[in-house]
Amino acid sequence: MTDITMRQLLEAGVHFGHQTRYWNPKMAPYIYGARQKIHIINLEETLPAFRDALKFVKEVASKRGKVLFVGTKFAAREIVKEEATRCGMPYVDYRWLGGMLTNYKTIRQSIKRLKELEERLENEENLVGMTKKEILNLMREKEKLSANLAGIKNMGSLPDVLFVIDVEHERNAVQEANRLGITVLGIVDTNASPDNIDHVIPGNDDAIRAIRLYCKAIADTIIDARSVLELQKDEEAKEEKTKAKTTAKKVVTKKAKVAEKAQAAAEKKSEKPTTEKRPTKEAAETKETSEEPKTKEVQQPIEASKAEAEEGK
């Protein structure tokens, strides 16, 4: 996260407020004093508030949240567009359309129409058979829509945070965000009210250097948070690859073991019919000895019966 110092705030002129006659009494806690009828903002209040806001933006960006940059005043337009595109966030730099958040469904239809016009005007084949007046009307419609909606063309859904330069000038945007419960992070000058601003950053909202400092710090914080996210993704992908490799090796080894066991079993089966058991000499002798007494026992009663028959004669 980018670290903001007191020197940077002083060099950018963040401490210069509006003329004393235009002040808002609700900003009294953030005012240090007055010099030549101009209020001086207390940077000891600005610095911690800005750092807290950057921490909050980092948390939102690390969860893939969207931060909508809003700065339609002339001094902020170019800076808001440049820094928002650098960090890949949506922005509103020309005019805040009523219902841009609260009536987002109709805004989506306008965005769809803008994309259709861009695709149609890119290919010359689509313009065949059209008159010059019809082509000019399409180009004017496209320019009008792109001026208001080019920054939120790829937003996709409602933002998570609204970062506003000059909350007094962009009070319609703040009101819509409050209705929808969207967190508002705003640069509040001495002529504005800090009410309904979730993260108040007291500071100069007119000086170009100050506006650039705010927007650059927010954009750098978002880029840092996204880079950390990408590193974590790469590490997770590497871990998954290593796990997949180890599991694949285990499966291969198991299959090899099963194949070896099957092969061994097949070899045993093939060996059984070829190896017939032949009776050994000892087994044959034991059989003969076991058969001899049986023959003797059978012969004895036969001889006795023969002797009795001879005596009778």
Curated annotation (Swiss-Prot):
SUPFAM superfamilies named among the record's database cross-references: Ribosomal protein S2
Single Gene Ontology MF annotation: structural constituent of ribosome
A biological-process GO annotation: translation
GO cellular component, one term: cytosolic small ribosomal subunit
Record's compositionally biased regions (Basic and acidic residues): 234-243, 266-297
Keyword field: Ribonucleoprotein, Ribosomal protein
Region (Disordered) location: 234-313
InterPro entries tied to this protein: Ribosomal_uS2 (IPR001865), Ribosomal_uS2_bac/mit/plastid (IPR005706), Ribosomal_uS2_CS (IPR018130), Ribosomal_uS2_flav_dom_sf (IPR023591)
Compositional bias per record (Basic residues), positions renumbered to this chain: 244-256
UniProt family annotation: Belongs to the universal ribosomal protein uS2 family.
Name this protein carries in UniProt: Small ribosomal subunit protein uS2
Gene that encodes it: rpsB
